[in-house]
Amino acid sequence: MNVVSTERLLLRPLEWADREAYAAFRFHPEVARWLSPVDRDPLAASEATIARFQSGWSTRGYAPWGVFCDGRLIGQCGLNFVPEFEATEVLWALHPDFWGKGYATETARAALAYGFDTLALKLIFAMTRPDNLASQAVMRRLGLLYRKNVVYKGMNAVWLDIDRARWTG
Protein backbone atom coordinates (compact mmCIF):
# COMPACT_ATOMS: atom_id res chain seq x y z
CA MET A 1 0.00 0.00 0.00
CA ASN A 2 1.31 3.45 -0.95
CA VAL A 3 1.21 5.53 2.20
CA VAL A 4 2.92 8.92 2.45
CA SER A 5 3.43 10.97 5.59
CA THR A 6 3.90 14.71 5.39
CA GLU A 7 4.87 16.97 8.26
CA ARG A 8 1.31 17.03 9.63
CA LEU A 9 -0.77 14.59 7.59
CA LEU A 10 -1.09 11.00 6.49
CA LEU A 11 -1.93 10.23 2.85
CA ARG A 12 -3.19 6.73 2.12
CA PRO A 13 -5.38 5.03 -0.45
CA LEU A 14 -9.05 5.18 0.43
CA GLU A 15 -10.70 1.99 1.63
CA TRP A 16 -14.30 0.82 1.51
CA ALA A 17 -14.63 1.66 5.22
CA ASP A 18 -13.90 5.34 4.37
CA ARG A 19 -16.96 5.75 2.13
CA GLU A 20 -19.24 7.53 4.63
CA ALA A 21 -16.52 9.92 5.82
CA TYR A 22 -15.56 10.53 2.19
CA ALA A 23 -19.17 11.33 1.25
CA ALA A 24 -19.46 13.72 4.21
CA PHE A 25 -16.40 15.72 3.14
CA ARG A 26 -16.77 15.49 -0.66
CA PHE A 27 -20.42 16.53 -0.74
CA HIS A 28 -20.16 19.25 1.87
CA PRO A 29 -21.77 22.22 0.07
CA GLU A 30 -18.62 24.37 0.22
CA VAL A 31 -16.54 21.55 -1.30
CA ALA A 32 -19.08 20.37 -3.87
CA ARG A 33 -19.45 23.83 -5.37
CA TRP A 34 -15.86 23.67 -6.69
CA LEU A 35 -16.02 20.13 -8.02
CA SER A 36 -18.04 18.56 -10.79
CA PRO A 37 -21.68 18.06 -9.86
CA VAL A 38 -23.00 14.64 -8.94
CA ASP A 39 -26.39 13.42 -10.06
CA ARG A 40 -26.80 10.59 -7.55
CA ASP A 41 -26.75 10.16 -3.83
CA PRO A 42 -23.48 10.99 -2.02
CA LEU A 43 -22.88 7.51 -0.61
CA ALA A 44 -23.27 5.83 -4.00
CA ALA A 45 -21.03 8.47 -5.57
CA SER A 46 -18.37 8.00 -2.89
CA GLU A 47 -18.47 4.22 -3.37
CA ALA A 48 -17.97 4.66 -7.13
CA THR A 49 -15.13 7.12 -6.56
CA ILE A 50 -13.33 4.85 -4.09
CA ALA A 51 -13.68 1.94 -6.53
CA ARG A 52 -12.23 4.11 -9.33
CA PHE A 53 -9.35 5.22 -7.13
CA GLN A 54 -8.62 1.62 -6.09
CA SER A 55 -8.56 0.65 -9.77
CA GLY A 56 -6.07 3.45 -10.45
CA TRP A 57 -3.75 2.12 -7.75
CA SER A 58 -3.99 -1.39 -9.26
CA THR A 59 -3.56 -0.46 -12.91
CA ARG A 60 -1.36 2.66 -12.91
CA GLY A 61 0.32 2.63 -9.52
CA TYR A 62 -1.27 5.93 -8.54
CA ALA A 63 -4.58 7.55 -7.70
CA PRO A 64 -5.74 10.14 -5.20
CA TRP A 65 -5.14 9.41 -1.53
CA GLY A 66 -7.38 10.14 1.38
CA VAL A 67 -5.90 12.93 3.52
CA PHE A 68 -5.97 12.19 7.24
CA CYS A 69 -5.32 14.55 10.14
CA ASP A 70 -5.15 12.94 13.57
CA GLY A 71 -6.93 9.88 12.17
CA ARG A 72 -9.82 11.85 10.62
CA LEU A 73 -10.45 11.87 6.87
CA ILE A 74 -10.33 15.55 5.93
CA GLY A 75 -9.98 15.40 2.16
CA GLN A 76 -8.33 13.92 -0.86
CA CYS A 77 -5.14 14.68 -2.75
CA GLY A 78 -3.00 12.90 -5.25
CA LEU A 79 -2.48 12.03 -8.85
CA ASN A 80 -5.27 11.18 -11.24
CA PHE A 81 -5.01 10.05 -14.86
CA VAL A 82 -7.49 11.98 -17.01
CA PRO A 83 -8.25 9.97 -20.16
CA GLU A 84 -9.89 12.94 -21.90
CA PHE A 85 -6.50 14.67 -21.90
CA GLU A 86 -4.23 11.58 -21.82
CA ALA A 87 -2.42 13.27 -18.94
CA THR A 88 -1.93 13.07 -15.18
CA GLU A 89 -3.29 15.76 -12.90
CA VAL A 90 -2.53 16.63 -9.32
CA LEU A 91 -5.72 17.31 -7.41
CA TRP A 92 -6.80 18.19 -3.91
CA ALA A 93 -9.95 18.96 -2.00
CA LEU A 94 -10.28 19.48 1.73
CA HIS A 95 -13.14 19.86 4.18
CA PRO A 96 -13.70 23.61 4.81
CA ASP A 97 -12.70 23.23 8.47
CA PHE A 98 -9.17 22.61 7.18
CA TRP A 99 -8.89 25.40 4.61
CA GLY A 100 -6.30 28.12 5.15
CA LYS A 101 -3.87 25.94 7.11
CA GLY A 102 -1.45 25.12 4.27
CA TYR A 103 -2.67 21.52 3.99
CA ALA A 104 -3.49 21.80 0.27
CA THR A 105 0.04 22.95 -0.53
CA GLU A 106 1.55 20.32 1.78
CA THR A 107 -0.39 17.43 0.27
CA ALA A 108 -0.07 18.59 -3.34
CA ARG A 109 3.69 18.96 -2.89
CA ALA A 110 3.83 15.35 -1.65
CA ALA A 111 1.78 14.21 -4.65
CA LEU A 112 4.05 16.04 -7.10
CA ALA A 113 7.13 14.54 -5.43
CA TYR A 114 5.58 11.08 -5.74
CA GLY A 115 4.79 11.69 -9.41
CA PHE A 116 8.18 13.05 -10.39
CA ASP A 117 10.54 11.25 -7.99
CA THR A 118 8.85 7.85 -7.63
CA LEU A 119 6.90 7.45 -10.87
CA ALA A 120 9.23 9.51 -13.10
CA LEU A 121 6.31 11.27 -14.78
CA LYS A 122 7.37 13.92 -17.28
CA LEU A 123 4.52 16.40 -16.79
CA ILE A 124 1.76 16.92 -14.24
CA PHE A 125 -1.08 19.37 -14.65
CA ALA A 126 -3.76 20.85 -12.42
CA MET A 127 -7.04 22.44 -13.37
CA THR A 128 -9.70 24.38 -11.58
CA ARG A 129 -12.53 26.75 -12.27
CA PRO A 130 -11.40 30.25 -13.24
CA ASP A 131 -12.96 31.74 -10.10
CA ASN A 132 -11.21 29.31 -7.71
CA LEU A 133 -8.40 31.71 -6.87
CA ALA A 134 -7.36 29.80 -3.73
CA SER A 135 -6.54 26.65 -5.72
CA GLN A 136 -4.77 28.69 -8.38
CA ALA A 137 -2.62 30.24 -5.64
CA VAL A 138 -1.66 26.74 -4.45
CA MET A 139 -0.77 25.77 -8.02
CA ARG A 140 1.47 28.79 -8.48
CA ARG A 141 3.05 28.31 -5.06
CA LEU A 142 4.10 24.84 -6.23
CA GLY A 143 5.61 26.16 -9.46
CA LEU A 144 2.83 25.29 -11.91
CA LEU A 145 2.42 27.74 -14.79
CA TYR A 146 -0.76 28.76 -16.58
CA ARG A 147 -0.98 27.20 -20.05
CA LYS A 148 -4.55 27.37 -21.33
CA ASN A 149 -8.27 27.33 -20.70
CA VAL A 150 -10.07 24.01 -21.16
CA VAL A 151 -13.56 22.59 -20.90
CA TYR A 152 -13.80 19.48 -18.74
CA LYS A 153 -17.06 17.66 -18.10
CA GLY A 154 -18.94 20.70 -19.32
CA MET A 155 -17.15 23.13 -16.98
CA ASN A 156 -14.70 25.87 -17.93
CA ALA A 157 -11.32 25.44 -16.26
CA VAL A 158 -7.84 26.90 -16.25
CA TRP A 159 -4.94 24.49 -16.86
CA LEU A 160 -1.58 24.94 -15.17
CA ASP A 161 1.28 22.45 -15.34
CA ILE A 162 4.84 21.69 -14.36
CA ASP A 163 7.40 19.35 -15.91
CA ARG A 164 9.97 17.22 -14.16
CA ALA A 165 12.84 19.48 -15.26
CA ARG A 166 11.29 22.48 -13.47
CA TRP A 167 10.23 20.54 -10.36
CA THR A 168 12.36 21.54 -7.38
CA GLY A 169 10.46 19.78 -4.61
Model-derived segments and spans:
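Short glycine-enriched, charge-decorated loop/helix-capping segments at active-site entrances
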Residues: 38-40
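Active-site rim helix/loop that mediates acceptor-substrate recognition in acyltransferases
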Residues: 42-60
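Acyl-donor (CoA/ACP) binding surface of acyl/acetyltransferases
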Residues: 1-34, 51, 64-169
